[in-house]
Amino acid sequence: LINDINPLTTKLSNDIYLNKDLFLRIKEVFDSMGGMSYNEEDARLINEIYSSFARNGANLNDDDKEIYRKISQELSILTPKFSDNVLKASNKINKYWIDDENLLTGIPQSFIDAASELAKKEGREGSWCFSLDTNFGIIVKFCKDRSTRKDVLCLMGSKCNGDEFDNTDILRKISKLRHDKANLLGYDTHADYVLNRRMAQSKNNVYKLIDDLIVPSFDKSKKEFDDIKAYAKELD
């Protein structure tokens, strides 16, 4: 349903934000703020509304508005398609079967019992069926068998990659459209566009924070990595 509704709501949103007459009235109020006495709440509301319109293309010229409309409409189709593929791929691999009881070692008994009951309902009594949407973390954390943990991790990590629900091409298109949209609105990247409304404000500030944390956190991270390696050897 969202695949049908999303383009319609996007068109409606564009019709509102790109309405020249409506934005002129908003801009008139915004530009007059310096000479008016607004309380804090009203001033914030005016700023938020103006910013929302500006971030959705209201300041663009007519030609760029049409480009913005086209980009928005394409994204309105691709974005739910991406999510739909993720959901379908998740459903496809959701039932994880284990037939060897020895591979269950370490998994809490309550989860083993639930998997056994599910297997019975599926007509495979004597096996265990784990729903990965709820049991993924349990298997990875508690299962003693390394090959099982690896198998589950690979299954979850390879969703929508090279199969019937492959999202690779969709991701490329979304990435390019987001970049083009950000450029159109005066931002270097999509990250800059998004972060402009967040505490970080820009990707450069994010990179600076990461760089500032690298040196003081490196030694502890290395120790944690060594501890994990040692723990993995113990499990083997």
Language model regions located:
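His/Asp/Glu-rich acidic catalytic environments and adjacent acidic regulatory segments
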Residues: 1-201, 212, 216-221, 228
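Short, intrinsically disordered, charge-balanced linker/junction segments flanking boundaries
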Residues: 232-236
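Catalytic adenosine-cofactor/nucleotide-binding cores of aminoacyl-tRNA synthetases and other
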Residues: 204
